[in-house]
Every structure is written in C-alpha cells, then in structure tokens.
Amino acid sequence: MNLTSIPALQDNYIWTLNDDSGRCLIVDPGEAAPVLRAITENQWQPQAILLTHHHHDHVGGVAELLSHYPDLTVYGPQETSHKGANSLVGDGDRIHVLGLDFTIIATPGHTLGHISYFSHPYLFCGDTLFSAGCGRLFEGTAKQMFESFQKLNQLPDDTLVCCAHEYTLSNLTFSHTFYPQDTEIARYYHEIKELRSKNGITLPTKLELERKINVFLRTKDVELQRLISTEPDHLDEWEIFATLREKKDSF
C-alpha cells in the first residue's frame, strides 16, 4: 500500500492510499484539482472518499470528484450528509476499502461530529491530533477533545498519524515554551525547521514520537501541570488540557 499526501489550499494535505493495482482512496479532499491531477499522473482508479468532518477545506472537492467518478462511495459522519457523503458512518463502525478494514473512532472537539479512520498503521484524524499539536475547538468542548486524544493515544506506537494541516513547526515552537530543556523537542524542532525551509512535508508522524513532543499528550506530566497551575492537584487532567488549548489559541 502506498501513502501519498497531496498539498492543497493554504496548508492542507489531502491523503491518498493506493494499492499495487492503482486503486485508491482519497481522504478529506478540500479541493478537486490537485486530486484529479494526481489521479491522471499516476493512473489511479478512485474507489472511495473518506471524510472526517464537514468543514469546507475538507469537503470542498467532493462534488467535482463525484462529477468525474459518480460511483464513488463517500464515507463520512452525519454532519457531512449535505456535503456529499453517501455512506454515513459513526463510532465503532467498520468499513472495508482497498482490502483494508478501517475502524471509525468518534473524535469530537474540533466539530461535534468529527470522526477518525484507523486501519493499522494508518490513522486519518483530520483536525483532531496534529503533529505536536491539537485542533481548534470550533464546536466541541475541551473535555471532548481531551477524551478524543485519550482514544487515539491507545493506538500502537507505530501508528502513522495522517493529519490534515502543516502546522508542525508552529506547534513545536509552542511545545518548546513548556519544555525548553527537552532534548527531543529541541532536536525535532531544528529538524523540522530545516525541512520546512526547503518546503518539505513533515507528515505523517508516528504516535510514538507524538507522545514525546506533543504537550497535549503529556497532561499527566507533573512538571507540565505545575507550569499550568499553582494548584494542579485541584485540577482534573482534562482541565490541564483545556488550559493548554486556551494558551495555544493566544500563542
């Protein structure tokens, strides 16, 4: 199976998976043109589209892709029913695409109906878990996003986190403010800074790495809790997470 990221819009990535026969699936096509180019250049045969949530930069290309490939199955949560999804899925559902079995994981927070798709090792998590970061809370609550992170954090170390935006460098800058002496964060920051200076793509990332560099996955850390609050013992872990998200909003 071959994993490809297609840059789109300002900082989006549209993910594709294709097998050796050229059959492919498409994840969160925010626009159609770059996907159609990739299909033509690689002689792919699209089989399905996976949608994580209803925002335009994730669904904007669906209608045009369906005009070219009207038989495509478009999987998505209920909130995408008016955005082109023709096969609605929810938490715990399983779908079979390209010979892979994907489990649907409800990951509300960014939107109320946001979902992620997991078929080891691939995790398509939209705007929930970013490399070194966390999606903004447009509809859901910090507690919902925290609980979504806990679900994703149960996946194996070698999970490939295929998120939808190139935010890694700015997220690492935020992480570094809490852990200025952390050698792993510092090392990775310089690696990513060099990569981005050449317009390189920082994704996918592995969950094993994210557990080391992503402050939103380190809310159990007593050192971090003390930086967040003078009375961390009086806060639930999700409240530490919520405070981090508030600080990131104004960072």
From Swiss-Prot:
Residues binding Zn(2+) 1: 53, 55, 110, 127
E.C. designation(s): 3.1.2.6
A single MF term (Gene Ontology): metal ion binding
InterPro entries hit by this protein: Clx_II_MBL, Glyoxalase_II_hydrolase, HAGH_C, Hydroxyacylglutathione_Hdrlase, Metallo-B-lactamas, RibonucZ/Hydroxyglut_hydro
Cofactor(s) recorded in Swiss-Prot or TrEMBL: Zn(2+)
Domain of life of the organism encoding this protein: Bacteria
Pathway: Secondary metabolite metabolism; methylglyoxal degradation; (R)-lactate from methylglyoxal: step 2/2
One GO process term, biological-process aspect: methylglyoxal catabolic process to D-lactate via S-lactoyl-glutathione
Keywords from the named record: Hydrolase, Metal-binding, Zinc
Gene3D superfamilies: Ribonuclease Z/Hydroxyacylglutathione hydrolase-like
Keyword set includes DNA repair: no
Top EC class, one word: hydrolase
Residues annotated to bind Zn(2+) 2: 57-58, 127, 165
Catalysed reaction equations from the record: an S-(2-hydroxyacyl)glutathione + H2O = a 2-hydroxy carboxylate + glutathione + H(+)
Transmembrane segments: none
Cofactor info, note text: Binds 2 Zn(2+) ions per subunit.
Protein family: Belongs to the metallo-beta-lactamase superfamily. Glyoxalase II family.
NCBIfam families per UniProt: GSH_gloB
Function: Thiolesterase that catalyzes the hydrolysis of S-D-lactoyl-glutathione to form glutathione and D-lactic acid.
Subunit architecture: Monomer.
PANTHER family: HYDROXYACYLGLUTATHIONE HYDROLASE, HYDROXYACYLGLUTATHIONE HYDROLASE GLOB
UniProt protein name: Hydroxyacylglutathione hydrolase
Organism expressing this protein natively: Erwinia tasmaniensis (strain DSM 17950 / CFBP 7177 / CIP 109463 / NCPPB 4357 / Et1/99)
Lineage, uppermost ranks: Bacteria, Pseudomonadati, Pseudomonadota, Gammaproteobacteria, Enterobacterales
